[in-house]
């Protein structure tokens, strides 16, 4: 029998795959975008950039920016009854509209 893999990217074939026309790195503006403390952001993982990538189970979740650490932002997400803190690179974040 083959032992089951428990890697970081397992079961993410659809979640972390890109359309062929969108291959490669995103535009530079996505790397340089800035967020304010208290701003709501969506976590949309950019699969071609691995630094500051959150766990894929949090792809599509919405959180609040609490601060900044280096290039990354400190984002709090409510998961069930707990508040979890993540350090996420801005390329994996999108601002919430409205």
UniProtKB/Swiss-Prot annotation:
Q: Name one GO cellular component term.
A: ribosome
Q: Where is this region: Disordered?
A: 1-27
Per its UniProt entry, which superkingdom is the organism in?
Archaea
**What keyword terms does UniProt attach to this protein?**
Ribonucleoprotein, Ribosomal protein
Q: Keyword Ribosomal protein on this protein?
A: yes
Homology family: Belongs to the eukaryotic ribosomal protein eL21 family.
Q: Please report the name of this protein according to its UniProt entry.
A: Large ribosomal subunit protein eL21
């Amino acid at each position: 029998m083959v032992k089951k893999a428990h890697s970081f990217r397992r079961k993410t074939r659809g979640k972390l795959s890109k359309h062929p026309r969108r291959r490669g790195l995103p535009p530079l503006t996505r790397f340089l975008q800035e967020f304010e403390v208290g701003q709501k952001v969506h976590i949309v993982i950019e699969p071609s950039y691995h630094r500051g990538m959150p766990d894929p189970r949090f792809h599509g979740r919405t959180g609040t920016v609490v601060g900044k650490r280096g290039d990354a932002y400190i984002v709090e997400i409510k998961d069930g009854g707990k508040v979890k803190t993540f350090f996420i690179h801005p390329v994996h974040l999108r601002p919430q509209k409205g």
